[in-house]
Amino acid sequence: MLTKSSLEGEFFVEEIMNLQNESDIRGIAMDTKEYQANLTVSAVREIAAGIVNWLNKMEKKDELTVGVGRDSRLSGPELKEALIEELIHSGVNVYDFGLATTPALFMSTQFSQFSCDAGVMLTASHLPYYYNGIKVFSQKGGAEKEDITYILSHTEKRQGVTAGKLTEADLLTVYANNLVAKIRTASYKDTEKPLTGFKIVVDAGNGAGGFFTEKVLQVLGADTSGSQFLTPDGNFPNHIPNPDNKEAMRSIQDAVLTNHADLGVIFDTDVDRSAVVTKSGDVLNRNNLIAVLSRIVLSEHPGTSIVTNSPTSDHLKDFIESLGGKQVRYISGYRNVINKALELNRAGIDTQLAIETSGHAAFKENYFLDDGAYVIAKILMLLPKLQEEGKSLESLIADLKQPLETQEVRFKLEAENYRALGKKIIEQIVDIQIPGWQIDPENDEGIRFRLSQPYGQGWFLLRMSLHEPLLVLQIENDEKGYIVPVLKKMQQFLNNYPEVNQEKLTPLIANV
């Protein structure tokens, strides 16, 4: 077994490989009472060497340039320093972009003033403060699962003939200027400040998205007073920076209503996801955000296909089809839906949008990059025209039917091989015989049932979490009073598996 020495002792290949999280790298970056750090300075040095080896395999260039950035996490500065030091030691030229966003790091490979061979972002998205991670981009796009496997399994260090050159640069300003130019070009108003007269509040959740107020919205003329949590703070003291989190969405809702804003914008930590709140306080995330963006792309590209992840509403499918489009449900995971969209385009099926209910959204016109700020830019392009026509954002999805009841339950799997347990449960629920439960054949992830009487009218999906030891149950119903009966039947079924922790379920059905 290959071992390596470092400041913090020996690192085994197996330990490095355990940091792989599909097409990302994630780990514990800070010791806590419950966890011991495994994404350490030593680990990051090994990973940096792996990135260099991966690039050398792909690019076969005498000189490589890599851009490096981080979000607001407490461990970010130290890990960034280690990453940069190892890259320079290997002879790679490095742009240190400091605080940045994940989409901006990819764009550093496209902007001519940088032309990076790769962009490397230190982030763990919305996970707790003690996590961190690494996302890697080449000029072709985000690293795939097999690329990360190669990086983590090829960490042999090579000293460059000469040390690389380090340059500090302001990437976010370049990135923001690019967004501003696109919004101006596409806006209904032929003016430098098409958002004059609009009040737009931003909630950055103390992540990296605060730049959007000053460098994008204010430049376009918007009033951003009332924006909150713009200062980067890796303790995340106000709420989880996650547009898929109810507490976070309540926070931006309150800000919109309190400040009488025309729009509220919320980003996750590294700005690859976003959501909006309308003037009336309505939340546009999950199915509603997919519907808004679907209407936009279908107005620009009639008949296009739209790839989503699996836990989307039946009503969303009907909405997209009513606009002349086609929804393709696929496996959760932003790389999965993006790759499915790329596959469809290669097959000659025009597919303009790949999007998850979590807020990851990637447009064909924007390199199929999941970019939360670009999503907001697409919406901002519409605001002046909607105002001129006396319409609201909500009007874009007035025809989208909303379920009367929804519920999500996450069951912790307390088994060493939790994936095997989850797979077994999903395989065995196929044989369940309950009147009103019918397996939906149009599904690629977990198992999806259509519900009819005596269980109302709706659906539920049972699937494994992509990143955590969780079994996720999502239910929608168009009739009131049927969520609990479904949950009770699910409880009876899961009682056969003692390693499934049902503590999140019990309060939902107690005394009902």
Model-derived segments and spans:
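An N-terminal, well-structured beta->alpha segment
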Residues: S6-L83, H89-S90, K165-I200
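Short glycine-rich phosphate-binding loop at a beta-alpha junction
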Residues: K61-D71, Y95, K199-V201, T304-S310, ...
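Proline/glycine-rich low-complexity loops and linkers
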Residues: F97-G98, T102, L152-I183, K193, ...
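Phosphate-binding and adjacent anionic-ligand microenvironments
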Residues: H301-Q474, E479-V512
